[in-house]
Amino acid sequence: MATTIKLEGEARSEFGKGVARRLRVANKIPATIYAGGEEPAFVTLPMRETTLALRHTNALFTIAFDGNTKMAVVKDVQKNPVKRIIEHIDFLEVKAGEKIDVEVPVFVEGTPKGAAVAFVDIQELKVRADVTNLPEKIVVSVEGLTDGTKVFAKDVVLPEGVELDIEDPEESVVTVEVPEDATESTTAPEAAAAPADAAAAPAADAK
């Protein structure tokens, strides 16, 4: 279920780098809400509340400004490359009951068998869902899986109401395998034991 966040903003009619700098000094973020073929809405949002809200992946925003209220999702976030502060946000207006495509981060849970380790092949999975049901993450269970097992996109268990939306459902999302260093560490003692046994043989013959 998507996290719904309400933000109180203000309409803005001034633009440009100078205006944007003044807004940031005043702890505000300039933003644009796009709505298909309609005219976009230009707003300013409180910096602290908005920055905290953006920690939620695929959150659904209700933005109130000057008597208007728009429901939207984040389209793009522009950050200062040095200070990493938010300089501008693009939102996409959505309607209740509308389905959209989103990229959702992939996480794994559980423990594979033996020395096997789970590797995430796709960091984000593209899915389609209602705007009120956008998942923040997709969890793939690797509990008890053995070395060489692959979890394909078509096999990922998605939340109810969420559909896979990628071109190749056979694409590997998670691979379970034993790392090379783990294999080497288990075979090294056996290799070391062979010379020791060979050295013991002449000693026994000398008796």
Curated annotation (Swiss-Prot):
One of its GO terms (molecular function) is 5S rRNA binding. Residues 184-207 have a biased composition (Low complexity). One of its GO terms (biological process) is translation. One of its GO terms (cellular component) is cytosolic large ribosomal subunit. InterPro entries: Rbsml_bL25/Gln-tRNA_synth_N, Ribosomal_bL25/Gln-tRNA_synth, Ribosomal_bL25_b-dom, Ribosomal_bL25_C, Ribosomal_bL25_long, Ribosomal_L25_dom, Ribosomal_uL5_bac-type. Keywords: Ribonucleoprotein, Ribosomal protein, RNA-binding, rRNA-binding. The keyword Lipid metabolism does not apply. Residues 171-207 are annotated as: Disordered. Transmembrane segments: none annotated. HAMAP family: Ribosomal_bL25_CTC (MF_01334). This is one of the proteins that binds to the 5S RNA in the ribosome where it forms part of the central protuberance. Belongs to the bacterial ribosomal protein bL25 family. CTC subfamily. Part of the 50S ribosomal subunit; part of the 5S rRNA/L5/L18/L25 subcomplex. Contacts the 5S rRNA. Binds to the 5S rRNA independently of L5 and L18. This is Large ribosomal subunit protein bL25. The lineage of its organism: Bacteria, Bacillati, Actinomycetota, Actinomycetes, Bifidobacteriales. The gene is rplY.
